[in-house]
Amino acid sequence: MASLIEKLLRTGDKKTLRQLRNYADSINALEDSFKTFTDAELREETDRLRERHQDGEKLDNLLPEAFAAVREASSRTLGMRHFDVQLMGGAALHLGNIAEMKTGEGKTLVATAPAYLNALTGKGVHVVTVNDYLAEYQSDLMGRVYRFLGLTSGCILANQDPAVRREQYAADITYGTNNEFGFDYLRDNMAWDRNELVQRGHNFAIVDEVDSILIDEARTPLIISGPAQGDTNRWYSEFAKVVLRLQPEKDYEVDEKKRTVGVLEGGIEKVEDYLGISNLYESANTPLIGFLNNAIKAKELFKRDKDYVIMDGEVLIVDEHTGRILAGRRYNEGMHQAIEAKEGVEIKAENQTLATVTLQNYFRMYGKLSGMTGTAETEAAEFMSTYKLGVVAIPTNRDMQRIDQSDLVFKNETVKFDAVVRDIAERHEKGQPVLVGTTSVEKSEYLSRLLAKDGIRHEVLNAKNHAREAAIVAQAGRKAAVTVATNMAGRGTDIMLGGNAEFTAVAELAKRGLDPEENSEEYESAWPAALEAAKQAVKDEHEEVLNLGGLYVLGTERHESRRIDNQLRGRSGRQGDPGESRFYLSLTDDLMRLFNSGAAERLMNSSVPDDVALESKLVSRAIASAQGQVEGRNAEQRKNVLKYDDVLNRQREAIYSDRRRILEGDDLHEKVQFFVEDTIMALIDDATAGGNGDDWDFHQLWTNLKTLYPVSVSADDIIEEAGGKSRLTVEFLKEELLSDARLVYQAREESIGSESMRELERRVVLSVIGRKWQEHLYEMDYLKEGIGLRAMAQRDPLVEYQREGFTLFQSMMEAIREESVGFLFNLEVEVTPAQDVVVEDAAGGHTEHVEPQVRAAGLEAPEKPAQLQYTAPSEGGGTQTRVETRSTGRSGNPAKAAEQDAAKDAAKRPAKKKRR
């Protein structure tokens, strides 16, 4: 079925490719005339195109000239001219598609033309990469093209100061990772002042390695969390003891493949007896189920010295891909606390979600979205259903010459790796470069030891030091090079036969102390000569490596996803170069062991000698079946994550939209008057629900009203004016009380001034929304945790989540209105009126208007938590958690924060010496 959908999605390919080809022809027709432009004239083209767009001309019409300008600018600044297929890829991106372009087709350069064209709108363009290194590298390199044409480029990196981030977003084109863009969106929606905002909208995004970011990493939502209120730590310790009494298979089941657990009837009874409760599954006990499941997972699925280590009384996560300790990272959803309880170490405070969004819903906010990858075809249906993105396969610049050999399968890992080493040794001896892909750090280090034992010089890369790895991968095509890498290592960098001239030139200029931004003119003048020298240096070696058969890619194991296998293969045979690929497999590989044990067992028990390789169709089918199972499971997980987040997303959009308008200075007076009317009418409706005036409880109604605002009219006055209780109508009661509330509100406004009242409204509503939204996220987490149990009652958990989530949202909105009204009427405030002040400057001084200052308890921006935890997808589809410590306790209020910074700076300055 999937293949049929993919075929249907691709029926428009020929038509789209014709359109893209026509664009390329139009750009080619302009090339000669653009070559005659001086540098200044080429730069002026940007202003001309921008003016035409402002006058109403569509970007589609400007595309040929804009792309021609970028092609010429790139030739002059980088010595790189866009091929026709790169122009076609760029046009596909501009039209909002995914451009499927094979490895080595120059995707980084492809992005420059559509980025430039869409930056002409002045609304900003975001180019999204898989790691900080690539974001910074691409921003520096391609920024030279943009600056040449009079545009600015920026780069968002982890741990940048907010002021720096704001400056980067203000650039015409901004590079960064998906996690950084997403977290900035969440932080902006936790801001208390518009001066804290860093992003300026979501106009157009180009996502590099789009399959990795929008597919592999989409199972894990972005979460910012802080220390939770209340003491839940005792439950972790309690359940760590409980699970020691439970037995696997008898009391609970464990699914190692899906990494899930399920408690059986016998286990439930034991837990209920231990805790002294009658029913674990009644609503009041719902949170306990999460503690129980985590305790079982900690016991069965998380192994000490494999998944984590204990150092200095602390549980530290071990990266499954690299084997390195991930300092400062913690498992989320209470899992880390459950492991701490199991190990008997100090249980650190659990976190509460402060803001969250899935990557799917973050990227769906962009007005236009596009992406590039070498391998999108297998997920074409998902790209269309989730993101409404079509996949366009762009032809290669030259025909592919790589030979993909059939898999070799061995009975066990030992003989497989022996064969791998023999193959590498033969290729190395004749000088052919070899790239070896492994699925884990453990395997790459094991192979490294075998190679060292045979005296084969090699490099080992483990997808952590991106800058070093990119440089090594770029040179992995040199003669006799042997590079062992985990599958994700160095991704996004081309392997060029004979070496990478561009990397060599960049390294040479860096050695001379030149920086593309700090010494831009000197750098630009030195670049052509440096690049030419580097090209000459690799040219001879390139020819030699071509004659040796090009790059040989050797996979030591099949990945869970066919795409990752194809990405590894795609490192070889770039730009029509010769190349070869082969996978060496064993029947004990994780994929076979977990997902197709039947086929593996039959072959294991066959009479074929251990050291003889099999080329079996049965094995190929088993591998395809296993990969299909994993891909199906992962797709289902992504779909499920999205379904639940869609419920929260509608609520998030409403709240964040309100917050943004308040921060940007919207007048809230009308909204507040609606709050007042709605809240008072709700109280009246409750009090007058039954009977007529003789039956209504006026005493209770007035008690409730007085908690809301200082009522200046009595119940007796209104009853008397109506002519008695029996003649009093609900409408008359509402009219009188609303009139009274308006008069009281007007009097309060007159006492503090209209401008100050508007500021008070803004601060109060913002404060209440922030607090209530965090409480609501906690409620939604709590609801989601126990919603799966509804299936036991033959109810659809998603439908129940939608229904109850909507009820919770309505309750929250009602509470926001009621609390805001109460604060606005009753809060004691201290007001500094608005004033005009003279500020000295070079011209002698100018007048600035200072907004009124309103101070009251609860209206200051809350202190940022001492620790914020950032949970996000890791490169490759896992989960990573980073803990950010705010040791200074810097205020979230800009004015207060500035005072703190000034005090801190003053404390650092040495005291002036007194003159004698």
Swiss-Prot record:
Compartments it resides in: Cell membrane; Cytoplasm
Annotated segments matching region Disordered: 859-916
Domain of life: Bacteria
Classification via PROSITE patterns: SECA, SECA_MOTOR_DEAD
Gene3D superfamilies: Helical scaffold and wing domains of SecA, P-loop containing nucleotide triphosphate hydrolases, SecA, preprotein cross-linking domain
Compositional bias ranges of the Polar residues kind: 880-891
Listed HAMAP family: SecA
NCBIfam families reported in the protein's UniProt record: PRK12904.1, secA
Entry's family note: Belongs to the SecA family.
Task of the protein: Part of the Sec protein translocase complex. Interacts with the SecYEG preprotein conducting channel. Has a central role in coupling the hydrolysis of ATP to the transfer of proteins into and across the cell membrane, serving as an ATP-driven molecular motor driving the stepwise translocation of polypeptide chains across the membrane.
Protein name per UniProt: Protein translocase subunit SecA
Organism of origin: Pseudarthrobacter chlorophenolicus (strain ATCC 700700 / DSM 12829 / CIP 107037 / JCM 12360 / KCTC 9906 / NCIMB 13794 / A6)
